[in-house]
Structures are given as C-alpha cells and as structure tokens.
C-alpha cells in the first residue's frame, strides 16, 4: 500500500470517544481487510487534483461509511433483534455524530509548531478520503449477500413464524430507505465540510498572496542593503523544518537589532508554520468561471489593441486629408487669383473692343465727310469716344476731373478734330493693352496637388475596416460639392449679416421711441398734476355753488347777519384784531377777490385747453412721424432685400457667363493653337529649301 493509505494508522492506539466514529481507523481496517486475501497494488490519486475531486471523493466516502454500517449491522444482528424499535432512529444519530467525529478528528491532529496548521489538516482529510475511496473501489461486488443475510436474520428473528417474501422485501426496502436517508445526511455534512474547507482555502490563498508580496518587498529591501553572512544563515535556518532552537535563531538577530526592526517580516515568516509547505502545494486548477473571465479579458485586450491601431490609422488618414485640404485651399486661392486676373483681362479686352469700334466709326465718318455724309454719325462717334475717355479719367482719378472734356457745342477753336480724338483713342487702347499685358494669365492650368501615396492606401484600409463593421462609410466629397457647400455657407452668412443689420435698425428705432417716451413722461406728469388741481377747484366751486343756491332765497341782510354772527374774540381783544377781522371779512373786497379768482381760473382753463390741444397735436405729429419712419424703414428693408436678391441673381448670372466665356476662351485658345501649329508647319514646309536633283543617268528621260 502507499504511504498515504498507511499514514492514518498511527491513530489506532487512540480510542475514539464513545458514541462517535473514527472514519480514518475504519477506512484503514477496511483497506487491510480488502487487501488481506488478494493484495492488489493501487496508486491513490495525487493531491494536485484539488477541489475538483472533493465532490466525488465525498460521495465515495459516504458510500464507504454506508458499507461500514452494513458490516456493523451484520455483526450485531442479535442486538438488533433485541432492540428492533430503535433501528429507525440509529442512522440519524450516526449522521449527527459523523460531523462531530470529523471535527474532533481535526482537533486531535497535532499542530506543527504549536499553531493551528490548516494545510496539515487538509492533507489528513484528503488522505482519509483517498483511503475510503480505495476501500470502496476494491470492495468485492457481492456485498448484497450480507445485506440479504442480515435481512433474513432480522426477518427470522423478528417474525413469529413463517412469513411470506413480501414482508421481508418491505423490511429490506425500509432498511434501504433509512440507509439512504443516513447517507444523505452524511453527504450534507460532507458538503458543509467541503464548503468550510473551500472558504479556508480561499483565505489561505489570500494570505499566501499577501505573504508573497511581503516576501517580494523583503527581497527588494535585502537587495538594497549590504550582504550579511549571519542574515543568510538565519534565513536558511528559518526556512528549514523549524526544529532549530529559539536561542540559535535569536543570536544573529540580537547582533542586528536595527535590521530586525527594519524587517519584522522575517520573524513572522519564521513563526508562521503554515509557510513551510507553501512550496510543496501544487498549483490549484482554475474554475470554469475564471477561464471564461480570462478569455473575455483576452478578447477585450485584443479589441483594445485593434481599436488603438484603428485610431492610429484614422489619425494618419486625418493628417493626410488635412494636408490635402491645405493644398486644396492653396489651389482655390490660386484659382481665385487667376479668375480675378481673367476677369480684369476680359474687362480690358471689352474696353479695347469698344474703343476699336468707336475708332472704326470715327474713321468711317471721317472718310465719308467729303461725300456729304450726315454729321450725326460723326457727332455720335465723338460723344462715344469722349464717354470712354471720361470713364478712363474717372477710373484713374476718383476726384474731380482736372481736364474736363471739351463740349462739342463750343467754338471751332476749342473743338478737337476727329484726328485728335482718334489719337487719344489709340493711346487709350495702348494703355489698356499695357495693363492687360501686366496680367499673368496661364495658358494651361497649373499642376494639381498630387495626393500622398499613403493616403489612398490608408483610406482603403479604413473603408475596408468600416465595411466589415457596422456603421456608415467615410464621406467622399468632390470638389464641386465642396464649392457648392462653400457658396451655400457664404450665402447663409450674408443672410445672417442682413438679418443682423435689420435687427440693429429695429433696435435703433426702439431706442429712439424709448427716448421719445421718456421725454414725454415729465409732460404727462405735469398735465396729470394740472388736471388734479382743476378737479379739486371744480369740486370746491361746486360745493360753494350748492351752498349759494340753498341760501339764495335770503336777502343781503341775511349775509350781513351771517357776517355779524361770527363769534367775537373772547377775553376782550384789542381794537387792532377787531379791525383786522373786519377788513378780512369785508363783503365788497371778498366779492372782488372772488371775481378776480374766477377770471384767473377761466384764463388758466383756457390756457390748459390750449396746451392740451397743442400737446395732442404734437403727439399726433409724433405718431405720424413714427409711422412714417416705420414705413420708410420697412420700405428700405424691402428694397435692401430686393437689391440683395437682385445682386445675388446678377452675381450668379455673371458667374455663369464667366464660366461660359472661360469655356469659349479655352476653345478659342485651342483653335488658335491648332491654327498656329498648322501655320508654323506650313511656314517651315515653305521655307525649307528643296534638295538638288541627282544627275540623269543613261537611259533616263526627263519628264
């Protein structure tokens, strides 16, 4: 047998507590019993199987426990006859006792260095499970015989006499059901133990990782420090089996107190007994979830690398397109400059054509003057010539003309002759030709900017990548489309500028209206105060008139009585006060003052009415002016928008005409080039001397 199968035999001397099972001892006894007759040689499974074999081994161990219970039941059939009613409860008790026995077995395992060693406990548990599995594998297949014999013995002992086979079968089924229940309980206990073992194993792995990190840090720190022979000796002693004494371990560290304080991890490594078998443990296989997670991580890494490459490719394509755009912008500026030069050259050519036409008309009129031709043609030609010369002078000098054109209706002395006008026209044509010669017009379009050789390949690669993936392809804009977009953008910008100008004008009108309203505010406040004062005066006058009407039936004597009925001044006042009171309430003066106040009130009312009418007139005039200004502003805006639209239409037409003229000019240039080439070839052919004829030979005749 192997060493793992015979390892738990040292526990035979120990007696298990009463009421508990010793699975290791029983498994070893079963292995010896199985190997007594025929000693087969088998190799237990290695420990490196890890957690993947714990489940099947627990089931096998559960079945082995079931076989051992069968043996005990076979051995003690007489006792079962005596205690038949207690049989159904016994498996449950054994099932509850099995985990306790396993726990007690764990507790009875001697620790390595005085500390709980989880690895040794795990090894002992695995060895016991392997022994149970080996015993179950080598158990003879005829194990149903003892069961049947046990069943028949139980049936013979428990029955009163002869019973049918149905009763024995029922009892056998009940016994097997009880055994199945016990096995399930044992399996559940084993599963709980497996879960605890897995949890402890995870904790050990975490601790192992932390220890490895600390060991790495310690190694780095040792590499930074000076080498010491005592340190290496102490590390060698600490990494052994742990049997060296504490004095031998303490001596080198006492000489290096600072080093031990700087590195307390060595003491921990030496005192921790579980670190002695870190190197002996095999690598645990990863779970399927970990494999799936690793595969997903690898896939994500690959996707990230692909995206990085694609990003770099896109940046390269972008740089290439940026360079091409810069080149296109330069070409566009060059084309605009060429278009401007062509436009100016065309304008000069038109002016030259018009000048030649006027000069031809002058020549015809001058030549026909002797034949009594009408003078109207000559005058019209001279007017056209002076108009062209005036345009040139206006173009050359934007200010006032220093040399005004002479009037043809003047005297014959001041009037220039047609020859002088023709001379001026010829000089004008010469100046136009000189200006046209200053324009640099290319007969052929310049070379276009050649694209970079890497740009099409990169673009093709990007298009291929985008074609394989979901999403739109890269936009490919032509030059005409870019120009159209540019023209549309310029038109939109012009519209926005026009709207901005309109908004600014509206804002200015609103500001003026606000200023006018602010100026009218104080006038309205003054008018409101005047109206309030008038209303108060009218209310006071109405009260006085109502009092006068109520006492109108009385005579003047009543008024005198009312004046005399005023209360006298108490205490015998002086005569001065009495005179003042008499003067204050004199009826004649009071009537005069009332008449004067009434006249003033009427005058003020008339002035107020006149001011109100003037204010209304001013307000009406202001409203009329504002309405007129608003209408004028709207008309101006409409006219401006119409002018803008007309300008755009004219600009488009001019552009179309310019394109047509450019095409015609290109065709004419091509035709002229062909004609010039034909003429040059003809001239060369005519100017080339003929070779002399060879002398005639005998027999030849001159034709």
From Swiss-Prot:
Signal peptide: none annotated. Highest level of expression in heart, and moderate to low expression in skeletal muscle, kidney, liver, small intestine, placenta and lung. Residues 1-113, 138-172, 228-256, 396-416, 540-583 are annotated as: Disordered. Residues 1-15 have a biased composition (Basic residues). InterPro entries: USBP1-like (IPR040171), USHBP1_PDZ-bd (IPR019536). The keyword Coiled coil applies. Keywords: Coiled coil. Residues 572-581 have a biased composition (Gly residues). One of its GO terms (molecular function) is PDZ domain binding. Disulfide bonds: none annotated. Residues 189-227, 289-309, 476-513, 596-681 form a coiled coil. Pfam families: USHBP1_PDZ-bd. Belongs to the MCC family. Interacts via its C-terminus with the first PDZ domain of USH1C. This is Harmonin-binding protein USHBP1. It comes from Homo sapiens (Human).
């Amino acid at each position: 047998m192997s060493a793992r199968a015979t390892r738990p035999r040292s526990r035979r001397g120990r007696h298990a507590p009463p009421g508990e099972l010793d699975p290791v001892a029983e498994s070893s006894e079963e292995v010896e019993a199985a190997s007594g007759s025929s000693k087969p040689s088998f190799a237990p499974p290695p420990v490196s199987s890890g957690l993947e074999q714990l489940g099947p081994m627990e089931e096998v161990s559960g079945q082995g426990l079931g076989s051992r219970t069968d043996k005990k039941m076979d051995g003690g059939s007489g006792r079962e006859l005596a205690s038949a009613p207690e049989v159904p409860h016994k498996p449950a008790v054994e099932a509850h006792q099995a985990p306790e026995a396993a726990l007690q077995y764990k507790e009875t395992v001697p620790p390595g260095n005085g500390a709980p060693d989880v690895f040794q406990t795990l090894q002992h548990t695995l060895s016991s499970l392997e022994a149970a599995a080996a015993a179950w594998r080598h158990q003879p297949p005829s194990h149903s015989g003892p069961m049947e014999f046990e069943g028949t013995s139980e049936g013979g002992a428990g029955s009163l006499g002869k019973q049918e086979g149905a009763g024995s079968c029922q009892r056998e089924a009940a016994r097997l059901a009880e055994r199945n229940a016990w096995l399930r309980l044992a399996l559940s206990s084993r599963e709980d133990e497996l879960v605890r073992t897995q949890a402890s194993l995870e904790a050990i792995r975490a601790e192992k990782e932390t220890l490895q990190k600390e060991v790495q840090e310690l190694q780095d720190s040792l590499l930074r420090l000076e080498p010491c022979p005592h340190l290496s000796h102490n590390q060698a002693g600490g990494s052994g089996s742990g049997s060296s004494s504490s004095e031998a371990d303490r001596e080198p560290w006492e000489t290096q107190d600072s080093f031990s304080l700087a590195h307390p991890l060595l003491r921990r490594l030496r005192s921790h007994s579980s670190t002695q078998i870190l190197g002996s443990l095999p690598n645990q296989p990863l779970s399927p979830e970990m494999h799936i997670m690793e595969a997903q991580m690898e896939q994500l890494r690959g996707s990230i690398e692909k995206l990085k490459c694609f990003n770099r490719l896109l940046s390269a394509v972008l740089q290439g397109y940026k360079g091409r755009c810069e080149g296109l912008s330069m070409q566009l500026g060059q084309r605009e400059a060429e278009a401007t030069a062509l436009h100016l050259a065309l304008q000069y050519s038109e002016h030259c054509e018009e000048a030649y036409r006027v000069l031809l008309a002058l020549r015809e009129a001058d030549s026909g003057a002797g034949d009594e031709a009408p003078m109207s043609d000559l005058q019209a030609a001279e007017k056209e010539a002076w108009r062209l010369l005036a345009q040139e002078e206006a173009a050359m000098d934007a200010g006032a003309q220093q040399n005004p054109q002479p009037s043809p209706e003047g005297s014959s002395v001041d009037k220039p002759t047609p020859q002088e006008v023709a001379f001026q026209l010829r000089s004008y044509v010469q100046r136009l030709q000189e200006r046209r010669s200053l324009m640099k017009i290319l007969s052929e379009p310049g070379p276009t900017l050649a694209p970079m050789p890497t740009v099409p390949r990169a673009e093709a690669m990007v298009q291929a990548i985008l074609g394989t993936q979901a999403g739109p392809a890269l936009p490919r804009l032509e030059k005409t489309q870019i120009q159209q977009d540019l023209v549309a953008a310029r038109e939109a910008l012009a519209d926005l500028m026009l709207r901005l100008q309109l908004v600014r004008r509206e804002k200015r009108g609103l500001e003026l209206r606000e200023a006018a309203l602010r100026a009218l505010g104080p006038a309205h406040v003054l008018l409101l105060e005047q109206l309030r004062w008038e209303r108060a005066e009218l209310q006071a006058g109405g009260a006085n008139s109502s009092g006068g009407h109520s006492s109108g039936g009385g005579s003047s004597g009543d008024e005198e009585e009312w004046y005399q009925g005023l209360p006298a001044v108490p205490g015998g006042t002086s005569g001065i006060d009495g005179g003042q009171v008499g003067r204050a309430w004199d009826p004649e003066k009071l009537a005069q003052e009332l008449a004067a106040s009434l006249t003033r009130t009427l005058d003020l009312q008339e002035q107020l009415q006149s001011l109100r009418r003037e204010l209304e007139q001013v307000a009406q005039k202001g409203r009329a002016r504002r309405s007129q200004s608003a209408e004028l502003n709207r008309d101006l805006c409409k006219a401006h928008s119409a002018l803008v639209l007309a300008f755009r239409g004219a600009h488009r037409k001019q552009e179309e005409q310019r394109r047509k003229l450019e095409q015609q000019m290109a065709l004419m240039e091509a035709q002229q080039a062909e004609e010039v080439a034909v003429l040059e070839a003809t001239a060369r052919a005519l100017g080339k001397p003929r070779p002399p004829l060879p002398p005639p030979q005998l027999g030849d005749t001159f034709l």
